[in-house]
Amino acid sequence: MTLLKDKLFLSEQTWRWYGPDDPVSLWDIKQAGATGIVNALHHIPNGEVWTVEEIMKRKELIESVGLKWSVVESVPVHEHIKTQTGNFRKYIENYKESLRNLGQCGIHIVTYNFMPVLDWTRTDLAYTLPDGSKALRFERAAFIAFDLFLLKRPGAETEYTDEEKTKARIRFEQMDEKEKQLLVRNMIAGLPGSEESFTLEQFQHELDRYRGIDAEKLRTHLIYFLKEITSTADEAGVKLVIHPDDPPCSILGLPRIMSCAEDFQALIDAVPNESNGLCLCTGSLGVSCANDLEGMMRRFGDRINFVHFRSTQRDAEGNFYEANHLEGDVDMYHVMKAFLELQQRRKVSIPMRPDHGHQMVDDLKKKTNPGYSCIGRLRGLAELRGLEMGIAKSIF
């Protein structure tokens, strides 16, 4: 809890850390001014129980430098749960046990997502900006080229317009073999925090698991999952926060069910338990111009227990890249203002983190996790901290 003038609640500033193998150290994070860590036990296979022993080992490591493990991101939802096949009931029981153990260890916010197969999707992990820094980018023509001519997904050609297919073929013909292989790696090799990586054949096999599962059916599976685990979360004092789809549109024929305000509302209506909460990610949701981020912050404020601040710059072709945190299409001032007012109304400091950052300055010479280099996020956190404080000083 953060107080200013004894009454004002400011956000808890957190930072995503990928564990002991992360090139950004806990001491780096402490020097950036963050106080909370967003972390997961990536070494534990999807579906297995997070034991108290493993949780405490990581928690004590974080606390050894004076930081706090504030948020879990994420306890992965096994694909069998999403498809309701195989051992999905056992995996749900394991998930419940992990929630109990996290609550017992004093960790009370757990992020998850219900995106099939892919966590988040970009075609370029090192897009060079005019200032020389590098960002993550989604190029629609390259994405469609991957789908049609590299993956060769059955039925894919029916999902795109003739104009899109023509642009994709032209784009594909411009690629040399090295660029094609890089595109494949970017699409399916798995990003930081992704627990699975695939060959093209394995990847298609994973996509095939979702044949016959449309958005309505996937939503039914999500609601079933939440109805099974929310009572456990309530008892453990754990808030579940679902991360929205990234990007918020259909990918490779896979259904998307957490892309807009209507999706959020449907989930809350179906599972009203207090533990059923939201992670508001301005970067993911902001890719769609139809999403009113300030309005969503106000409408769903009682359910928002974690915030990712990120901005994207989109164009009319369906492309976007990750912009600086205070630039791009997200009106960060008004979103932050709504966030600050939300915290005053609820009288609570809500964890937020700078979501992604440009690879810049010294980090350009280093091997970094895409989107998770140190200096770009340090800049983002400083800008967001200053914006929040400036708004707070001016209106409270």
Curated annotation (Swiss-Prot):
Its EC number is 4.2.1.8. Its cofactor is Fe(2+); Mn(2+). Transmembrane segments: none annotated. Belongs to the mannonate dehydratase family. Catalyzes the dehydration of D-mannonate. PANTHER family: MANNONATE DEHYDRATASE. This is Mannonate dehydratase. The lineage of its organism: Bacteria, Pseudomonadati, Bacteroidota, Bacteroidia, Bacteroidales.
